[in-house]
Amino acid sequence: MDRSLFSLFGHGVLRFAALGVATLGFVGSSPGIPAGGAKPEDDWRLLEPVTYENLTVFPVVSASGHDTRAFLTLEEALSSGEIIVREQGAETIVRNRDRNRPVPRGYGAPSVNQLVLINRSKRPLMLLAGELVSGGKQDRIIAKDRIVPPGAEPLPLDVFCVEHGRWSNGAQFSAANTIVHPSVREQAAVKQNQSDVWASVTAGSVATESLAAPPAAAPRMSADAINEAVRTEAPTQSYNKIYNSRAIGGSVDSFVEEVQRRFRRETSGLKGERVVGVVIAYGGEVAWSDIFASGELFDQYWNKLLRSYAVEALARPTLREKASSEDAREFLRRLNGRETTESEPGVYRWLEISEGSLSQIELDALQPKTITLHRLVLRRTS
């Protein structure tokens, strides 16, 4: 099922298109040498790579960063009850402006690709494509990076389903502390197609092996293991249940523990710098990066990001070839290609740049000043 990029909802919630583009960028640097840009936000460098089996993680560190404490993450907000997520069409209770009485509102019939979100906190909510919310009629993932302002009207939220076999009332939506692995996240963030999201959930990895690549060992996470997990523990094809199942979850856990141990060892001696992101390679191919505006923000996402990278690594063939630091620096150059923007004035701007097989996506907060909260670069698999 293809999802429409723009829709009209209820009482006229509008999407805005912005003509401007994000101006904050990141420039690669040699280990130990600050980046070439003079701006504080460009002052970062790559540490030595952390490698385990077919996964290589290049830590990105910075001596400067933005204060991001004003922003609320999905996990924080759901755990504290500062946001409410409901199925579209369910009665949603909100307070009117004078806060004297509740006002019931409905937003049409339930929809696979739409939820309703209310930000009741005093902080803007940051959402990343691929973050999972569990419950409702089926588990969903956030469709696109965005910011939800505090005190806003109930928001029709674009999502993708990652539980193909269920459409029935379940528990209230809750924090899953999960972001789907890159093969699934790409389908949401770039391709924006529900059928492709469903297919990628049970495919493991959708990356295709290059004909020029050297011979590789079979993936540790086989199609048979995924099918067994679906058969025995995840009959509704729930992403969360598949990748936390006995057939798969144990392998992911041990993989994550070893990478985390090596990562901590590499980053433990930092003085005056913080890890703000990572560049990810599988075998010799640099494939992915997530960089944040501050070390604090990176820390909040790191555990679930690492698990997502590990799932992808286990689903890909094991190649002996390793990516170099120069490969990672080249991968992080600012792209020069077709640009697409979306914006909510005074709240956020979303920018995508496409060049060849690469996509760069930036989420800018526009208040209290313009900063790039998150920057994603990925090598598309199709």
Name what the model sees in each region.
Residues 2-18:
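Bacterial N-terminal signal peptides that target proteins for export
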Residues 21-30:
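Hydrophobic h-region of N-terminal signal peptides that target proteins for export
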Residues 30-125, 130-382:
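Intrinsically disordered, low-complexity segments enriched in small/polar residues
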